[in-house]
Amino acid sequence: MWVYGKPVASSVCMVSTNSLAQRLGHSADAKLVILSCDDLGAFHAANVGVYDALRKGSATCASLMVPAPWAKHAVMNYNGDDIGVHLTVNSEHEMYRWGPLTYAPSLQSGEGGFPRTIDDLWEHADPAEVLRECRAQIARALEWGIDVSHLAPHLTAITLRPQFFDVYIELAVEFQLPVRLPSTLTEAQAGFPFRKLAAEEGVLFPDHFDHDWREGSRERVLNSLRNLQPGVTEIHVQPCIDTPEIRALGDIANSWIDDYNFVVNDASLKQAIADSGAIMIGYRALRDAMRAQ
């Protein structure tokens, strides 16, 4: 097994019998919540929105899209926040594109940049090029001075196919970083035991995560808090401030702007968190526990 590019003892892979909450220093029935922000670095509006959500609102961590156009701006405004790498091999917007850091012909679409859809990616991507590209994104974030706390794939692109999931877990082990994994998909639906495979490699991940990517987070977040289960639950949002730049992408911007108002300005979220009994944490707690095992 390899960590930070160096071989380490196989005992690192031993799976603890304690619950994740217990490994984080809490009781087994504790309800811990990670409120994460996606797409830091994608837009200027996202950078301002995400940092406001972290510093003024209820969010606890975020993930950086290293190949995206505003990534360097996000880094320039970084101040030790709990930030992971949003492993990116798709570019979903028709008029706003980004592409690989590395030479990766199989990750280029006909219109330039990464493929727009997951199906297009899955049809053409070479796993070796996906591995090299994703490793480069993590390395770039570290070189920029980000204290990387976790890995979270953009659009779940490398989670739900075995050949790309292998890449995901290899990098999690190499850099000793926890990962985001959906809990609402069964092994039968995915076609392979992805959560079991990650656990067997000693990779930590939240107990609960609903990978619902439909627009708008308000009701989904409130429903998750009303029905909070013991363990670690990740809930994701995508906050952006209201600017002409983000409005130019179309109606999809409405949900991102609402996410911002909800997470930063809406007292109902703070009340829902208090009513749920949630203990708010970030991914850094999982990373530190993973590296201590």
Protein language model annotation of sequence segments:
Residues 2-34:
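N-terminal pre-catalytic segment of deacetylase/amide-hydrolase enzymes
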Residues 32-34, 59-61, 80-86, 148-152, ...:
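Structural preference for beta-strand elements that scaffold enzyme active sites
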Residues 38-40, 65-69, 86-90, 154-156, ...:
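Active-site beta-loop-alpha junctions enriched in small/polar residues
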Residues 44-69:
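A short alpha/beta connector and helix-capping loop motif
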Residues 50-56, 71-84, 99-109, 143, ...:
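Acidic (Asp/Glu)-rich catalytic clusters
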Residues 94-122, 251-254:
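Active-site gating loops and adjacent loop-to-helix segments of metal-dependent hydrolytic enzymes
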Residues 127, 135-204, 211-219, 226:
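Catalytic domains of cell-wall/extracellular-matrix polysaccharide-remodeling enzymes
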Residues 180, 249-293:
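C-terminal domain-boundary segment and adjacent tail
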